[in-house]
Design a protein with these regions (language model features):
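Structural motif
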Residues: 29-33, 84-86, 129-135, 181-185, ...
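Beta-rich, blade/repeat-based domains predominating
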Residues: 53-71, 104-118, 153-172, 201-219, ...
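Conserved beta-propeller blade signature
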Residues: 19-23, 74-77, 118-121, 172-175, ...
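Short loop/turn segments immediately following beta-strands, especially the blade-tip
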Residues: 35-43, 88-95, 136-145, 185-193, ...
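Asp-box/WD-like beta-propeller blade repeats and closely related beta-sheet repeat scaffolds
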Residues: 95-167
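Short loop/turn segments immediately following the C-termini of beta-strands
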Residues: 25-27, 37, 80, 124-129, ...
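A short beta-strand motif characteristic of beta-propeller blades
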Residues: 45-59, 97-103, 146-155, 192-201, ...
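Beta-strand-rich domains and repeat architectures in extracellular enzymes and scaffolds
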Residues: 16-37, 50-73
Length: 324
């Protein structure tokens, strides 16, 4: 059951599996809802609810992306109400095995990303109470995260970070800063070390993004700009400052907040909260995007949240608020 309190968070494991996972994020005990997916027609079957051992926080209000992330064998989910995140093992039947809870190293964790054995958690912080931070972890032999500590990033008070993710090859870490109107990129090593913070400034209201599945240094970001809401593609080589490759949107691209791409990178979608719509972009080998069309439901009410694409690029899944 997809309810209003579901966080903006989908996860489809990086394997030829059939699981779909959603974080509930209520003001109380947090949980992950698990579904199995019919690979032929895409339909979902409910598996069960799995408590994270942490707490959600409705005050986040959807200002987050990638609150759940999965590898071939594990799933990780943030608990913004208890300042920690949970590790699960993935079972063959789509169910989850609780492994443990780890402190996020900050306040209000809203996003999480993993590359190899390295995890970074984005803590949104709380204005006047705690600063935002991006905290690194490595997976131990027991499969549980251990804090790196040395490479934690502390942000300015007004940053309001909403999303963190690695690029395709894990060589760049991308952080979207909604309050600072900026996108940060870091060079990342296989042991989790971060160097060379490069900032792309003047990017109005970035909320959610995704990596390019084919270009190692290209990422996409949805900009909830009051004047020109749109999707942008950026290039972050780590040598020069990150730059905007292209920018595109349609009249129905109102309040774009989340993004997803097919495995071949030829299709990119933005999920547009205010319009309740989806915008399709054509992805080019150069890293540029071009707006193609929009899916606008019969009801014009808001509520389009996170989106995810299956591993074959055949099915798109969208989380809807205000619907069950």
């Amino acid at each position: 059951m997809f309810a209003l309190l579901c966080a903006a968070a989908f996860a489809l494991p990086a394997r030829a599996g059939n699981g779909v996972y959603v974080s509930t994020n209520p003001n109380g005990a947090n949980a992950v809802l698990a579904y199995t997916r019919n690979v032929k027609n895409g339909l979902l079957t409910y598996v069960g609810r799995f408590d994270t051992g942490g707490r959600g926080l409705v005050d986040i209000g959807g200002a987050q992306s990638h609150a759940v992330v999965a590898t071939r064998t594990q799933l990780f989910v943030v608990n913004p109400g208890s300042n920690d995140f949970t590790t699960f093992a993935l079972r063959d039947d789509g169910s989850l095995l609780f492994m443990g809870v780890t402190s996020s190293g900050g306040v209000r964790p809203v996003s999480i990303t993993v590359s190899g054995n390295v995890i970074y958690v984005l803590n949104q912080g709380q204005l006047g109470v705690a600063t935002a931070s991006c905290n690194g972890f490595t997976l131990g032999d027991d499969g549980l995260p251990v804090s790196i500590g040395t490479y934690d990033v502390i942000y300015e008070a007004e940053a309001i970070p909403t999303d963190v993710f690695f690029t395709r090859n894990g060589a760049r870490l991308v952080v979207l800063l909604n309050g600072s109107d900026a996108i940060d990129t870091f060079s990342a090593s296989v042991d989790g070390a971060l160097t060379v913070n490069r900032r792309l400034a003047g990017v109005s209201n970035p909320v959610g993004g995704t990596m390019s599945p084919v270009q190692p240094f290209v990422a996409f970001a949805a900009l909830d700009d009051d004047t020109t809401p749109r999707m942008i593609s950026i290039r972050a080589t780590g040598i020069a400052l990150p730059s905007i490759v292209s920018s595109a949107g349609l009249a129905s691209t109102i309040s774009p907040c989340w993004a997803a791409a097919t495995p071949n990178g030829k299709k990119v979608w933005s999920s547009n909260f205010a319009a309740g719509s989806l915008t399709l972009f054509a992805g080019k080998l150069s890293g540029s995007i071009q707006a193609v069309s929009s899916y606008v439901p019969a009801s014009s009410s808001p509520g389009s949240l996170d989106v995810a694409v299956d591993q074959r690029g055949k099915f798109l899944y969208r989380l809807r608020a205000f619907n069950s």
